[in-house]
Regions:
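Conserved aromatic-histidine-acidic binding/catalytic patches
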Residues: 11, 132, 174-178
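Active-site nucleophilic cysteine motif
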Residues: 137-140, 144, 175-190
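Solvent-exposed loop/turn segments at secondary-structure junctions
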Residues: 83-85, 176, 204-207
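Intrinsically disordered, low-complexity N-terminal segments that are enriched in acidic
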Residues: 1-87
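Hydrophobic/aromatic-rich core segments of domains that either
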Residues: 184-211
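Eukaryote-specific, cytoplasm-facing alpha-helical/coiled-coil scaffolding segments in long proteins
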Residues: 37, 173-174
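Acidic low-complexity segments
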Residues: 74-173
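Proline-rich low-complexity regions
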Residues: 26-28, 102, 196
Length: 211
């Protein structure tokens, strides 16, 4: 498989006004996988406080900077990582009936504040699966994916990344949004249909061989 090395750099220049400024920047995942390997992050600038940390309550890495007093506020944060191409050949997929779901995957079947699995979410998921006559986890995932592609759209007017409130989206019938909305819509419907699913966000840093 082809391996590539990338450097992702933030260059931040905050306004000089006010007595205090704080900065949070998301960083690449430091938990190496079979297709992504972190080689660390470095920073430079004039922050009063600077540290590499994790988002509270999660394992997601971040950079935190704080400036006390007015004046220039700059920070440059660089992260280096390697990626390895991967493909999954679904032609050879076979369902193992009665196979146990790994403990680390079970949490991807649970409801969250933004991903309720009852009410309209469950009703919609079961309707999609029934209409597609989907039985295996792969068939269900494919049916839900196709439904999301056919019925949702990216709305450039959505603020930020969207709220990911799929219950409100389904109740209103407005399935437009941005990444958090569309990703969470698929994840919620998949979980409601009994298929483990999770959000996985990232930054596109190269051309895709598949899209």
């Amino acid at each position: 498989p082809r391996t590539q090395t990338y450097r992702v750099t933030y260059k931040v220049d905050l306004p000089a006004d006010g007595n205090k400024a704080r900065l949070w920047l998301p960083l690449p995942d430091i938990n190496d996988s079979a297709h992504q390997f972190s080689q660390g992050s470095v920073w430079s600038g004039n922050a009063t406080i600077a540290q590499f940390d994790t988002v509270p309550g999660t394992a997601s890495p971040m950079f935190y900077g704080e400036w006390r007093g007015g004046g220039p506020r700059t920070a440059t944060v660089s992260s280096v990582g390697k990626t390895t191409n991967r493909t999954v050949d679904l032609q050879h997929y076979s369902e193992q009936r009665g196979a146990a779901i790994p403990s680390g995957v079970k949490r991807y079947l649970q409801a969250t504040k933004r991903i309720p699995l009852d009410g309209i979410v469950r009703k919609t998921a079961l309707s999609i699966v029934k209409e597609a006559n989907a039985h295996s986890p792969l068939q269900k995932a494919q049916a839900i994916y196709d439904w999301v592609v056919d019925n949702s759209y990216r709305d450039p007017e959505t603020r930020g990344c969207g709220r990911g409130d799929i219950k409100s989206m389904l109740e209103s019938g407005n399935l437009g949004g941005k990444c958090a909305d569309l990703n969470t819509l698929f994840v919620g419907l998949a979980r409601a249909a009994g298929v483990p699913a999770r959000d996985n966000y990232g930054i596109r840093i190269d051309e895709s061989a598949a899209h």
